[in-house]
UniProtKB/Swiss-Prot annotation:
Membrane topology of the entry: Multi-pass membrane protein
PANTHER family assigned to the protein according to its UniProt record, in alphabetical order: ATP-BINDING CASSETTE, SUB-FAMILY H, MEMBER 1 (PTHR43038), RIBOSOME-ASSOCIATED ATPASE (PTHR43038:SF4)
GO biological process: positive regulation of translation
Tagged with keyword Cell membrane: yes
PROSITE patterns: ABC_TM2, ABC_TRANSPORTER_1, ABC_TRANSPORTER_2
Keyword Cell membrane: yes
Protein name as catalogued: Ribosome-associated ATPase
Pfam families named in the record: ABC2_membrane_3, ABC_tran
Limits of the ABC transporter domain: 13-248, 277-507
Gene this protein is translated from: rbbA
Binding annotation for ATP 2: G309, S310, N311, G312, C313, G314, K315, S316
Gene Ontology terms: cellular component: cell pole; cytosolic small ribosomal subunit; membrane; plasma membrane
Species this protein is from: Escherichia coli (strain K12)
Length: 911
């Protein structure tokens, strides 16, 4: 890298007394630092030392807890300054593609960011074409970002960051997990851009010490504090160290580095050792994707064999196939001469496996973790205490035996995970990137433990890594890329074979050969006028940019869009037919102890009703009890002796009626039906026995039902289900759209771009309003053509009300999303908050006027109550806007209230 001469200009960022906490964890501890401008500044240190927290404060993505942060001449606590400098800062967060949208193409991702920064169509085309050409992504402009390699995602993220020509470029571990070739190309591209845009300041966090050698100025960090600053050469001179990693170790506090010892690796002596692991044409496919492509290797007992490659190249997949955790699609693998068989427990007991995530039980202490794994591997109970004590002593865990793993530093958790993996004394140890993110002292201690296991205990160690200095410690390594093994041998053999100066250069040469590339650097993008236009307060371009992006993602996610439509249809069918107040086809049986014409006439009168179905008669109380228990009948009727005679004499008669009371409301309805049928039969008998003169009365009253003459449930329930589903489904979808961004990390684009909270929420809301209206038309079609419930009133009135109601529903989803951080929580939270008021307090079953207390108040203010009345009014009563206009007023009031509250509660910075 060309080290640019430092020009005496004001610092690009100044921090004074900055502290940051996450719960009880101290991320930054009273940091005071001036970061020079117009140079490449690197923050170095392992994971968890505060690098990302520091960068997020400088970028404005995180709220400042304590202290002052000045960036580009202004205070980052000041919202106005943050808004003003936002177009001058670019932020590329940690994690490959974290700020990208994986269903969008390469072009669409860059275009989205260009729209956010206010570029018009012509300018966007020019800038995007230049960036894609300069980074070599032009041939892949139509490929979805999710299908790019790690290096290509890295370049795409850089394109998105550079689309607005920033003055400050912030890169948070941009090359972690990327292959050496992509890493080298990335930094060459950054160098070229800086040469053309001399006023650009670049701030980088990295865990690679070799990478940090290239930077102009370094900030060494540990435990949230700054250890030292200066160039790499200055840090080496200050600590009298040969390498930057050695300098970093010497800068650590005495208590932390006192246990450090240089790793000593005795030469490996094969001595005709047996083969511990052998793979022949091992292949793994996931659909059409080939994760591992015909891999071959042989590893003798006691060897440290390294798998070197970038994230996603197939290392972890290969290891899982070797341990039997994943069945191979093709090829064969052997452990100690036996074919790999997931069911062969004896062979698997000879293997220890340590995953990237360490696989510890956080609710158990260190000692309990060791004891549990000892029992899982069937170590005799009497031997467990001694074995646990041995592991604690060997891996230096005695002082933390009663502490939970999540409370331990990363390096100690790493040693505990290794102790757990070897507690059953395996003959082979498979380690999947065990040192990722660990500080150099802990990494060297871990390596010394591995070397002792290999050389003293003759344990075969198969380790994957993407650190070059670790690969050089292995007896042999295999260079892997895109599922294929490029070369195998000792590190020295691979370097000599390529005539390279280092293992990294050799790996790059192998990668170039595999890809058919040359060493020609990519052309840097043309630098445009970096004068940033004044930022607009509210931009429809940014709003519609989010709407367009959300619509594209929704269209390309068939599961989400299909469930949104088909889920509504299915729920409508289930609820329309499933929710019914109708009590019909009641099976009854009669215990007739009279057996006269009158008793038979009474029975025929009951069976002639559409509400009752007669079953074979009863003969005894025992049969009555048995058939009612079995659910064969719902109603049992006993007609007493002399029933007909008493009727003829006008003597009062009594019938015995047994009703299944498992459902009280249904039983009450059945009781009313039987009483009504009995009274009707008595009146009919009396009318036949009376004279014509006596039959005439002063008046004759008949009851008629308007709007629903047959008192059927469908005409009442179906129009009520429409508001219920239009509240639940659109609100869930809109809530998930925001929470999904929080989970994936792309919410960072809201924090660090000029987008306002209102632009973000309104932009995301529009596609779901359109989808909600489509759902509305589907539900109306089902109501009319499937359920046979005609719509008699003004459909325009119902459509207008539905539009307002869906705006409220999606707004409620956005409001709920401001409190939720996971999609599962968003689904449950939205379901509870929308379904309970809609079903219990909005008049779906019981009228709002019949409610009391808080339930009545909820029913009066909840939007579903008003839209449900409009839906029933237009469906059943043929009403229009002139009849229903007053019900629109609460809906119109609710929209600004819900949306205003959502915008107010949405955070523009991470808390």
């Amino acid at each position: 890298m060309t080290h640019l001469e430092l020009v005496p200009v004001p610092p690009v960022a100044q921090l004074a007394g900055v502290s940051q906490h996450y719960g009880k964890t101290v991320a930054l501890n009273n940091i005071t630092l001036d970061i020079p401008a117009r140079c490449m500044v690197g923050l170095i240190g392992p994971d968890g030392v505060g690098k990302s927290s520091l960068l997020s404060l400088i970028s404005g993505a995180r709220v400042i807890e304590q202290g002052n942060v000045m960036v580009l001449g202004g205070d980052m606590r000041d919202p106005k300054h943050r808004r003003d400098v936002c177009p001058r800062i670019a932020w590329m967060p940690q994690g490959l593609g974290k700020n990208l949208y994986h269903t969008l193409s390469v072009y669409e991702n860059v275009d989205f960011f260009a729209r956010l920064f206010g570029h018009d169509k012509a300018e966007r085309e020019v800038r995007i074409n230049e960036l894609l050409t300069s980074t070599g992504l032009a041939p892949f402009r139509d490929r979805p970002a999710g299908k790019l390699s790690g290096g290509m995602k890295q370049k795409l993220g850089l394109c998105c960051a550079l689309i607005h020509d920033p003055e400050l470029l912030i890169l948070d571990e941009p090359t972690t997990g990327v292959d050496p070739l992509s890493r080298s190309q990335f930094w060459d591209l950054i160098d070229s851009i800086r040469q053309r845009q001399s006023n650009m300041s670049v701030l980088v966090a990295t865990a690679y010490m070799e990478e940090a050698e290239r930077f102009d100025w370094l900030v060494a960090m540990n435990a949230g504090e700054v250890l030292a600053t200066g160039s790499a050469e200055e840090l080496r001179q200050q600590t009298q160290s040969a390498t930057l990693e050695e300098a970093f170790i010497n800068l650590l506090p005495q208590a932390q580095r006192q246990a450090h010892q240089a790793v000593v690796i005795p030469p490996y002596q094969p001595e005709n050792a047996e083969i511990a692991i052998e793979a022949r044409d091992l292949t793994m496919r996931f659909g059409s994707f080939v994760a591992v492509d015909h891999v071959n290797f042989r590893i003798p007992r006691g060897e440290i064999f390294g798998f070197l490659g970038s994230n996603g190249c197939g290392k972890s997949t290969t290891m899982k196939m070797l341990t039997g955790l994943l069945p191979a699609s093709e090829g064969e693998a052997w452990l100690f001469g036996q074919p790999v068989d997931p069911k062969d427990i004896d062979t698997r007991r000879r293997v220890g496996y340590m995953s990237q995530a360490f696989s510890l039980y956080n609710e158990l202490t260190v000692r309990q973790n060791l004891e549990l794994h000892a029992r899982l591997f069937h170590i005799p109970e009497a031997e467990i205490p001694a074995r646990v004590a041995e592991m604690s002593e060997r891996f230096k865990l005695n002082d933390v035996e009663d502490i939970l793993p999540e409370s331990l530093p990363l390096g100690i958790r790493q040693r505990l995970s290794l102790a757990v993996a070897v507690i059953h004394r395996p003959e082979m140890l498979i380690l999947d990137e065990p040192t990722s993110g660990v500080d150099p002292v802990a990494r060297d201690m871990f390596w010394q433990l591995m070397v002792d296991l290999s050389r003293q205990d003759k344990v075969t160690i198969f380790i994957s890594t993407h650190f070059m200095n670790e690969a050089e410690r292995c007896d042999r390594i295999s260079l892997m890329h895109a599922g294929k093994v490029l070369a195998s041998g000792t590190p020295q053999e691979l370097v000599e074979k390529r005539g390279a100066a280092s293992l990294e250069e050799a790996f790059i040469a192998y990668l170039q050969e595999a890809a058919g590339q040359s060493n020609e650097a990519e052309a840097p993008p043309v630098v445009h006028d970096t004068t940033h236009a004044p930022r607009q307060g509210f931009s429809l371009r940014r709003l519609f940019s989010y709407s367009r992006r959300e619509a594209l993602e929704l269209r390309r996610d068939p599961v989400r869009s299909t469930l949104a439509l088909m889920g509504t249809v299915i729920l409508m069918l289930i609820m329309g037919y499933g929710i019914s107040m109708d009590v019909e086809n009641l099976r009854f049986a009669v215990l007739d102890r009279d057996q006269t014409v009158s008793s038979q006439a009474w029975t025929l009168n009951l069976s002639g009703s559409r509400y009752f179905i007669e079953q074979p008669p009863l003969t005894s109380y025992d049969e009555l009890d048995r058939r009612m228990r079995a659910g064969d009948i719902t109603v049992a009727i006993e007609i007493p002796p002399n029933f007909g005679r008493d009727i003829a004499r006008g003597t009062p008669v009594e019938l015995g009626v047994w009703i299944d009371g498992a459902m009280p409301s249904r039983a009450e309805t059945v009781k009313g039906y039987v009483q009504a049928m009995h009274q009707s039969w008595l009146q009919d008998v009396a009318s036949r026995q009376s004279t014509p003169a006596s039959q005439s009365g002063l008046m004759n009253i008949e009851t008629r039902y308007r709007y629903n003459p047959d008192v059927k449930s469908l005409p009442a329930i179906v129009p009520a289900v429409i508001p219920l589903l239009l509240m639940m489904i659109p609100s869930m979808l809109s809530a998930l759209s925001v929470v999904r961004e929080k989970e994936l990390g792309s919410i960072i684009n809201l924090y660090v771009t000029p987008t306002t909270r209102s632009e973000f929420l309104l932009g995301k809301q529009l596609p779901y309003i359109a989808l909600g209206m489509l759902n509305f038309f589907l539900l109306c079609g089902l109501s009319v053509f499937v359920f046979g419930v005609p719509h008699k009133g003004s459909f325009l009135t119902l459509t207008l009300a539905a539009l307002l109601y869906i705006i409220i529903a999606t707004g409620m989803g956005l409001l709920i999303s401001t409190f939720m951080k996971s999609q599962i929580a968003a689904i449950f939270g939205t379901a509870i908050i929308t379904l309970i008021p809609a079903t219990q307090f909005s008049g779906m079953i019981d009228p709002v006027a019949s409610l009391e207390g808080p339930g009545r108040w909820i029913g009066e203010v909840y939007p579903t109550s008003h839209f449900l009345t409009i839906a029933r009014g237009t469906f059943s009563k043929a009403l229009d806007l002139t009849d229903l206009w007053q019900l629109f007023i609460p809906l119109l009031i609710a929209i600004p209230l819900v949306m205003g509250l959502s915008i107010l509660l949405l955070k523009k910075q991470e808390g």
